[in-house]
Swiss-Prot record:
Belongs to the MinE family. Keywords: Cell cycle, Cell division. One of its GO terms (biological process) is regulation of division septum assembly. It comes from the Bacteria. Prevents the cell division inhibition by proteins MinC and MinD at internal division sites while permitting inhibition at polar sites. This ensures cell division at the proper site by restricting the formation of a division septum at the midpoint of the long axis of the cell. It comes from Chelativorans sp. (strain BNC1). This is Cell division topological specificity factor. InterPro entries: MinE, MinE_sf.
Length: 87
């Protein structure tokens, strides 16, 4: 029985595995970033088009990657007479 090990650090393997999974997800996203943004843009347009008419040229999708966080910015210009309910 380890007397001094009782108060020591817990196993860090699960934490390291989780960090590695997050890192790999970010790396995979950055490798296919342009493809991912294009796919997301088309899917967003398709979902919005189910409810209102929107010009596909008025939909902008942008992905930024920082050291600690990645952001996805979506800008959709919806006309006042869109044929749907106002938000």
């Amino acid at each position: 029985m380890k007397i001094f090990g009782f108060f020591g650090k817990r196993a860090s393997a699960p934490m390291a595995r989780e960090r590695l999974q997050v890192l790999l997800a970010h790396e995979r996203a950055s490798l296919g970033k342009s493809d991912l943004v294009a796919i997301l843009r088309e899917e967003i347009i398709a979902v919005i088009a189910k409810h209102i008419q929107v010009d596909s040229e008025k939909v902008n999708v942008k992905m930024d990657r920082d050291e600690k966080v990645s952001t996805l910015e979506i800008d959709v210009e919806i006309p006042l007479q869109a044929g749907g309910r106002a938000a």
